[in-house]
Amino acid sequence: RNDEAALPAFAPVDESLVAMNALNLTQRPPRSPRVRLGGYTILPRLLDKARATLAGTNGDYIYNNPNDGHFFRFTGLTPEALLEQVKSGAGDWDMLLWVNEHAPLKRTALEIQQWADWTESVSFNDVEMREWFTDQIKRLNPAREDLRGTFDYLDLDDFVSFGGVA
């Protein structure tokens, strides 16, 4: 018989572990928002930005930006709760297990797939943001007619920001 209180999902670790797992986003971009973890888009990029933010190596990348908000609204998690769990030093798989266990909005695999597919096609939906998007495409390469959505822009901007040619 085990009368001890349940252990926390992840024991606290030295913050140097978080720094060791963090990407330096001043030297390379986070993962594409298209990369999936447990079916979720955005999550791997979000974890990269969270780890880099904690390590002070996030550069121009902002944790909990509007794109990240799609993930938080879909799962019901708060940015603060996820960031607190990232501090544990957990890797991607353990973070996914934590998300699935602690997300207030429990989603089926089909719901996650449909949401992820939607995020890959979502575009800027108000006039001001569409104008901003158009200006950004002009800045990156006005000849690019293949750029339609948020993920297209983020992928290209990441590429160009680190020396690529659009």
Residue ranges, per PLM feature:
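N-terminal amphipathic/basic-hydrophobic helices that include classical n-h-c signal peptides
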Residues: 1-19
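Polar/charged low-complexity regulatory segments
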Residues: 21-58, 118-166
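Amphipathic secondary-structure elements and adjacent low-complexity, charged linkers
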Residues: 13-14, 18, 25-29, 104
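Alpha-helix initiation and N-capping motif
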Residues: 40-43, 79, 92, 112
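Amphipathic protein-protein interaction modules
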Residues: 86-141
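Amphipathic alpha-helical packing elements
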Residues: 57-99
